[in-house]
Amino acid sequence: DLHLCDRRQRQMCIRDSYPYGMRGVCRFVRAADYSNCDRYKFFESSKDVLIILQLEGIKAIENLDEILDVEGVDILFIGPYDLSQSLGIPGQVNNPVVVNAMKDIVERAKAKGKVVGTFVDTPQDLKMWKEIGVQYLSYSVDVGIFIDACKQLRKSFE
């Protein structure tokens, strides 16, 4: 039924339950705590949904104005690694081409009052993107942080 929604409003059709959207209502999924929640409360749960659109390629940049006009999106999250690959320089997330593309997204999104997020590998990158205006910063991953802590601990024993 998603094809019935206006192209720009598809995310909201997915997010919201009746009467505003067409979100599935199966109570036996994770969102419903595998049926461990009150069946009527579940239908109200679309009020508690956080919509994060991931911008990870050239198409996202090309369609950014349209994306920025979608109502109800809470966060635009830039995926720097996938974006770098889409730009033809895989893994080079600090390459000026990638950085400038990301800065453009941040500027345009902030001009529309949108919250922007991204992933960073280093404390230096975190500081840089924070200064640029990114409000939601995801640093490393749990396993990476754990490995770094183990390496530091091991060094302290030497």
Feature locations, PLM:
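Glycine-rich phosphate-binding active-site loops on the catalytic face of alpha/beta enzymes
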Residues: R7, L76-Q85, Q135-Q152
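Single conserved hydrophobic/aromatic residue that forms the stacking wall/gate
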Residues: D1-D16
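Glycine-rich tight-turn/loop motif centered on a GG-T
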Residues: S17-R27, S86-N100, S140
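Alpha-helix-loop-beta-strand connector modules within alpha/beta enzyme cores
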Residues: Y18-Y20, S46, N94-V116
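Hydrophobic faces of well-ordered beta-strands that scaffold small-molecule active sites
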Residues: I51-E56, L76-I78, V116-T118, L137-Y139
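Glycine-enriched alpha-helix->loop->beta-strand junction motifs that scaffold or abut catalytic
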Residues: S17-P19, V70-I75, E131-L137
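Short, well-ordered coil/turn segments that N-cap beta-strands
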Residues: S46-I51, G72-D74, K112-V115, V134-Q135
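Conserved, mostly hydrophobic/aromatic
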Residues: I67, G79, W129
